[in-house]
Amino acid sequence: MGNTSSERAALDRQGGHKTPRRDSSGGSKDGDRPKILMDSPEDADLFHSEEIKAPEKEEFLAWQHDLEVNDKAPAQARPTVFRWTGGGKEVYLSGSFNNWSKLPLTRSHNNFVAILDLPEGEHQYKFFVDGQWTHDPSEPVVTSQLGTVNNVIQVKKTDFEVFDALMVDSQKCSDVSELSSSPPGPYHQEPYISKPEERFKAPPILPPHLLQVILNKDTGISCDPALLPEPNHVMLNHLYALSIKDGVMVLSATHRYKKKYVTTLLYKPI
């Protein structure tokens, strides 16, 4: 009776509504709520949809990793070259660095190239060639548990130490005030005017060294007739012509190749 009176008093305080009792196992007298079984066919579509979205989830995590790295420490962007050598008509690049959006590549002869400024770290990417997703087997790859294969690239600071050093040197040498400049004074542009006495001058006399043509010299009896004597260095790289005989002009030139001298003859009919 004590319990009945206490329940009745509680009902009066709650407006006459009585909450359902629960047993020791947590069940309600009004009926148990439906439970989702792990192996029931009702949740098969749920797990199937999760398996389908797993690659997209992995790509999203890779993209999210790049965003977290950028938020933590804004690393310096480094020029990175992407090249596709597998042929095709239209090639696009997609990666974790651009939220897996398609970026067209520029055609260069038989290759497709793109240069992007990427922060330091690891980045995944793929190629979209003529409507098909593929990866470059000649570059490093990473494979997920579901078999998704992506190319991976490591952008390291050490790969650009030479360029950084050159940039520092160029900045140090940017001040050219200490360099020698042109002498002070006015500068003009005046055309050359030949003097009247220069017009009637005869051509200069041929230097005597060029008169000693090796083709005009007689070879000694003890020498090989196929070999010519060693020419003087002033005779090199000059064109010599023989007087025209029987309608044929003969031209010759001597060149030096290391320690050897080669004389070439050209016969031209006229």
Swiss-Prot record:
Q: How is it modified after translation?
A: Phosphorylated when associated with the catalytic subunit (PRKAA1 or PRKAA2). Phosphorylated by ULK1; leading to negatively regulate AMPK activity and suggesting the existence of a regulatory feedback loop between ULK1 and AMPK.
Where is composition skewed (Basic and acidic residues) in this entry? 9-36
For the modification N6-succinyllysine, the affected residues are K201
Give the molecular function GO annotations.
protein kinase binding
Is the keyword Phosphoprotein in the record?
A: yes
Q: Which residues are the lipid attachment points (N-myristoyl glycine)?
A: G2
Please provide the record's keywords in A-Z order. Fatty acid biosynthesis, Fatty acid metabolism, Lipid biosynthesis, Lipid metabolism, Lipoprotein, Myristate, Phosphoprotein
Q: Which residues carry this modification: Phosphoserine?
A: S5, S6, S24, S25, S40, S96, S101, S108, S182
Q: Which Pfam families match?
A: AMPK1_CBM, AMPKBI
In the record, which positions carry Phosphothreonine?
T4, T19, T148
Q: Give positions of region: Glycogen-binding domain.
A: 68-163
Keyword Transcription found: no
**Region annotation Disordered: where it falls in the sequence:** 1-44
- Swiss-Prot/TrEMBL GO biological process terms: fatty acid biosynthetic process; signal transduction
Per the record, its GO cellular-component terms are: cytoplasm; nucleotide-activated protein kinase complex; nucleus
PANTHER family noted in UniProt: 5'-AMP-ACTIVATED PROTEIN KINASE , BETA SUBUNIT (PTHR10343), 5'-AMP-ACTIVATED PROTEIN KINASE SUBUNIT BETA-1 (PTHR10343:SF84)
Annotated function: Non-catalytic subunit of AMP-activated protein kinase (AMPK), an energy sensor protein kinase that plays a key role in regulating cellular energy metabolism. In response to reduction of intracellular ATP levels, AMPK activates energy-producing pathways and inhibits energy-consuming processes: inhibits protein, carbohydrate and lipid biosynthesis, as well as cell growth and proliferation. AMPK acts via direct phosphorylation of metabolic enzymes, and by longer-term effects via phosphorylation of transcription regulators.
What the entry says about domains is: The glycogen-binding domain may target AMPK to glycogen so that other factors like glycogen-bound debranching enzyme or protein phosphatases can directly affect AMPK activity.
Subunit composition and interactions? AMPK is a heterotrimer of an alpha catalytic subunit (PRKAA1 or PRKAA2), a beta (PRKAB1 or PRKAB2) and a gamma non-catalytic subunits (PRKAG1, PRKAG2 or PRKAG3). Interacts with FNIP1 and FNIP2.
Question: What is stated as this protein's family in its record?
Answer: Belongs to the 5'-AMP-activated protein kinase beta subunit family.
Q: What is this protein called?
A: 5'-AMP-activated protein kinase subunit beta-1
**Which species is listed as the source?**
Bos taurus
